[in-house]
Amino acid sequence: YFAPQTWTSDDTDASERTKIQYGTSYVYPIVSMGSHVSAVPNHQLYRTTPIETRANVAYFGTFGYELDLNLLSDAEMASVKKQIAFMKEYRELIQVDGDFYRLLSPFEGNETAWMVVSQDKTQAVAALYQRLNKVNASWLRLKLEGLDPDAKYQVSCDLTPSSSFDTELVKRYGYDTVGNQVKTYEAYGDELMRAGIPVDRQDLNKKGGDF
């Protein structure tokens, strides 16, 4: 018997969930995994992760919120609205139509990555997660899978800083934390799969550093 939906774990910490959901995906489709944006500090690990990271992990499951919205800051509420709009736009791709690909294993390194590709290979959503920030870490290339090698794709990389990163202390040191920051360019499928998407560690730092 296969349940249409299951609660994979009471552990809703975003960093831990990359392992939980990555491993579960070997046996069950991601649409069957209950995945929520929960409160921080996490009730089990007492770890605080940005609300953007929690959503970015929860997207690849059923997606929902498990927290008191009244306790969120204005910046976090703005992020929630953006997250809901994103999920409405891509829910069918992620939960119904798409094929799921595991790109980087959380059990083998500091990064986790996975993606979903539509059946006709015209659309895809990929996610890259960094566990811990490292000093002077080199660039990495996120190599995608499942694309049409001969198709030209419009690539959009969301580099918008985390709302939790938008503090006076951060601004004092000159980090750019203002507004939506999306990098776009065109590339063929074979380039995205063989050469990959170049990722500057400074871009990951803008997302909030750890997690």
What spans do the regions from the language model cover?
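Conserved, mostly hydrophobic/aromatic
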Residues: 58, 126, 155
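Glycan-recognition surfaces
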Residues: 1-70
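C-terminal beta-sandwich/jelly-roll accessory domains of carbohydrate-active enzymes
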Residues: 132-211
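Carbohydrate-binding surface patches
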Residues: 106-149
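Catalytic cores of secreted or luminal carbohydrate-active enzymes
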Residues: 55-104
